[in-house]
A protein has these predicted regions:
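Bacterial N-terminal signal peptides that target proteins for export
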Residues: 1-17
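Bacterial N-terminal signal peptides
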Residues: 14-27
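Helical hinge/lid and interdomain linker segments adjacent to catalytic or ligand-binding clefts
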Residues: 32-39, 46-145
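Catalytic beta-strand/loop cores that center a nucleophilic Ser/Cys/Thr
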Residues: 33-35, 70, 75-76, 90-93, ...
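Active-site-proximal beta-strand elements of phosphoester/diester hydrolases
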Residues: 51, 231-233, 272-276
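A glycine-rich, often tryptophan-bearing local segment used as a flexible ligand/cofactor-contacting loop or short
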Residues: 101, 110, 114-208
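Proline-centered loop/turn at the N-terminus of a beta-strand
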Residues: 134-136, 229, 270
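A short acidic/glycine-rich loop-to-helix N-cap element
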Residues: 278-288
């Protein structure tokens, strides 16, 4: 069996990405922050990555993306993880030291789920959103925060995905990303997803060079809103393979979009939301390019 030059290049890139994920798995990383300094030329911009979910391995996805953006695109990247009491990474932990890094950040990439951060930590996210900083939200960040009734008097209770107050209905997910938790679309961990570019959006800057997007994560329901600029549609497949047949019972559903949210005093912040982003998803070159 012969392997083409293009095939070797693709294999090499895949091995490098797998290595990056392994190096920064929860067993090895033990303290916040992990910092990747910008390669040359530097853009002079800083991105903060906030990782803490307990199912899709945000603690693997975000360091890999941060390193790519630093080495190949010239961004200074700071990755913050949920930590346990010993200072070691704990998937889904509601303890993320170092969030003060958001004070001078030019962008925030968030991948969290059901967090109830201490007031002194959540304040930094609140401050960032008040100044309408750009946000990229992945997968479970639509339900990234969850506060129980014991914390109803917490100043940041409104960020909970179940918040029903008229001042911030739907919490962080709805108010910032445009979508709160709705539910799975198909059988998660049994059906993978093909992501197709909407033809009319093929020239959008975010979609430059994006093709053949397949992700392992199962579909999420999306209730499209008028203020979404929808870029892609997700088609659930019958198998976990890229060539799996379409699930004919599941029409395509919006999967990536842009929008604006309102910070303090009505200032608008830019948002990109993806309903995917599991660590297996970024093994696909098309999805990595999309993010």
């Amino acid at each position: 069996m012969s392997i083409t030059k293009a095939g070797l290049s693709s294999l090499y890139s895949r091995l490098l990405l797998v290595l990056a994920i392994l190096l920064f798995s929860g067993a090895l990383a033990s303290a916040n922050p992990v910092i990747y300094k910008a390669g040359n030329p530097s853009k002079g911009k800083k991105i903060v990555f906030v990782a803490s979910d307990h199912e899709y391995r945000a603690e693997e996805t975000l360091p890999a993306l941060a390193r790519i953006l630093a080495v190949h695109h010239g961004f200074d990247c700071t990755v913050l993880f949920g930590l346990d009491g010993n200072g070691e990474i704990e998937a889904g932990a509601s303890n993320i030291p170092g969030l003060e890094a958001l004070k001078d950040a030019d962008g925030m990439v968030i991948f969290t789920r059901f967090l109830a951060l201490p007031v002194e930590q959540m304040k930094h996210i609140d401050d960032y959103l008040n100044r309408a900083g750009p946000v990229v939200g992945l997968r479970t960040s639509t339900h990234g925060f969850k506060y129980d009734d014991k914390r109803k008097n917490d100043p940041y209770y409104k960020y909970s995905f179940r918040y029903t107050g008229e001042d911030y209905s739907g919490g962080f997910g709805h108010q910032v990303l445009g979508q709160s938790w709705v539910g799975h679309y198909g059988r998660n961990h049994q059906q993978s997803t093909r992501i197709d570019i909407i033809p009319e959006k093929k020239n959008h800057p975010i979609l430059k060079g994006v093709s053949k997007v397949h992700v392992h994560a199962g579909g999420y329901n999306a209730e499209a809103q008028k203020d979404w600029d929808i870029l892609t549609m997700a088609q659930p497949l019958m198998t976990m393979k890229p060539d799996g047949a379409d699930d004919k019972t599941k029409p395509p559903m919006a999967s990536e979009w842009t929008r604006h949210y309102k910070g303090k005093n009505g200032k608008k912040g830019r948002v990109f939301t993806s309903l995917y982003g599991a660590s297996e998803d970024i093994l696909n070159a098309g999805y990595r390019r999309l993010i």
